[in-house]
A protein has these predicted regions:
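Conserved PLP-enzyme active-site core in the AAT-like
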Residues: 2-22, 26, 43-49, 53-56, ...
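Short N-terminal edge-element motif at the start of the domain
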Residues: 28-32
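Acidic, PIN/NYN-like endoribonuclease modules and their adjacent C-terminal/linker elements
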Residues: 36-40
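Flexible linker/loop signature enriched in Pro/Ser/Thr and Pro/Gly
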Residues: 60, 80-83
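Structural motif
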Residues: 84-87, 111-114, 169-170, 203-206, ...
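Conserved C-terminal alpha-helix-loop-beta "cap" of PLP-dependent enzymes
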Residues: 307-424
């Protein structure tokens, strides 16, 4: 095996260092295996219950009326996530788009949106109107309020209680930390927050941004009271095969409201051609528990490797995982660049490309990105990026298989060793 890694540029020293770390993680990895096995059975049961057949893999065009594959897939998602209804569509271009559809579909002028975990993803700032933008919720008369987390990264229940008022219509809970330094939330924590919110105002819609979280646990936020969960098919649930798409799962009313924003009033979920992606959507969802498991193993492997070398990592090497994003503070621009070059060199696509920092629109510093993916922007595929400013943190994620995620981590370490940035 070592000889095969040598052909890919991994030295004996780096391979042995990684092998020792991997051996120490066997018990942890077995837990991921058990979670994936449970979730695999859950998806399989949903597919069997809804009688998925070869007919479901057909294509529709134009209006997309009576697309049996689309309709069956949405039932499979709803049964897997234990919700009343679901939209799963290629017309939803990304996670931000799915969230925007869900928000606009369920909020009206005069309503207020509450974020109880601080500011959401940067990409939602213009959707909400935190940063002025044409067509934002703010422009339509929807107000916004946020409550910061406590210093220990937990919910500030006293401030949340005070923030909820007669205008509060929807509470948006972001499960994953994304590119923030706060902890990601467990499903249990989210359930406790939802129970608290609904004890104050029962008619509030609790929506969870589920991106990066699907199949990490054996339960989803929809199992603990969420009215809607929203995500992207180029993350976990697409299993690396979905070329595009997003989903909105939840109560029949919430999903129906969202459908009228996705298309238009009067049409809703009845239209939307699938254009030949049904097979990829079904197969990707079937594989998603296993693919997510590989990405989780890669994240924990990276945390253990770099923590052992003295780098601050978030989450740390022993924390329970709520998503597969791993942050490593590398301390120097050279370290960040070397790490990303290693990830790119491990890619199946564009491995010959040399990533460099660049002025990315919307950021106050240069950013370096590494991704050699089959699907552009796919977060479930091996990738890494980070802003060129202290603490020079890299955000590592993905890997369609554990073996590929492992190679990516070893290759990042190899590049740092070659540059003299670490000593093993």
């Amino acid at each position: 095996m070592k000889e095969m890694y040598a052909q890919l540029g991994i030295s004996s020293e780096v391979y042995d260092f990684g092998h020792k770390i991997e051996e120490s993680l066997k018990e942890r990895f077995e837990k991921f295996d058990k979670t994936a096995e449970y979730n695999q059975m859950k998806v399989l049961l949903a597919m069997q219950k809804n009688k998925v057949s070869a007919e479901c893999f057909g294509s529709s065009s134009g209006y997309g009326y009576d697309d049996i594959g689309r309709e069956t897939l949405e039932k499979v998602y709803a049964d897997t996530f234990h919700t009343e209804a679901c939209l799963v569509r290629p017309q939803i271009t990304c996670g931000t788009h799915a969230l925007a559809i869900a928000l606009f579909g369920n909020l009206r002028p005069g309503d207020e949106l509450l974020a109880p975990a601080g500011k959401p993803y940067d990409t939602l700032e213009e959707v909400i109107g935190i940063r002025p933008s044409k067509g934002s919720l703010a422009e339509y008369g929807v107000s916004y309020r946020q409550v910061e987390l406590l210093e220990d990264g937990t919910f500030d229940y006293n401030s949340i209680r005070k923030a909820i008022n007669e205008k509060t219509r929807l509470v948006e809970i972001q499960r994953s930390k994304g590119y923030q330094t706060r902890p990601s939330f467990s499903v249990k924590q989210i359930g406790e927050l939802i129970s608290f919110v609904k004890s104050i105002k029962p008619d509030v819609i609790c929506m969870v941004d589920n991106c990066y979280g699907e199949f990490v646990d054996t339960i989803e936020p929809s199992d603990v009271g969420a009215d809607m969960i929203v995500g992207s098919l180029i993350k976990n649930p697409g299993g690396g095969l979905a070329p595009i798409g997003g989903y909105i799962a939840g109560t029949k009313e919430c999903v129906e409201n969202a459908s009228y924003r996705m298309t238009c009033p009067g049409l809703g979920s009845e239209v939307g051609a699938t254009l030949g992606v049904n097979r990829s959507f079904f197969q990707g969802f079937f594989l998603a528990p296993m693919v997510t498991k590989g990405a989780l193993k890669g994240a924990v492997f990276a945390a253990n490797i770099y923590e052992k070398l003295g780098f601050p990592v978030i989450p740390d090497s022993t924390e329970p995982r709520q998503d597969f994003i791993q942050a490593v503070s590398l301390g120097t621009p050279e370290g960040l660049i070397a790490f990303c070059k290693g990830i790119q060199a491990a890619a199946p696509v564009d491995s010959y490309v040399d990533p460099e920092p660049w002025d990315m629109p919307g950021y106050d510093s240069q950013v370096i990105m590494a991704a050699g993916a089959f699907v552009q922007g796919s977060s479930i595929e091996l990738s890494a990026d980070g802003p060129m400013k202290p603490p020079y943190a890299v955000y590592f994620q993905g890997g369609l298989t554990w073996e590929h995620a492992k190679l990516g981590v070893l290759m990042s370490l190899q590049k740092m060793v070659d540059k003299g940035l670490v000593t093993l």
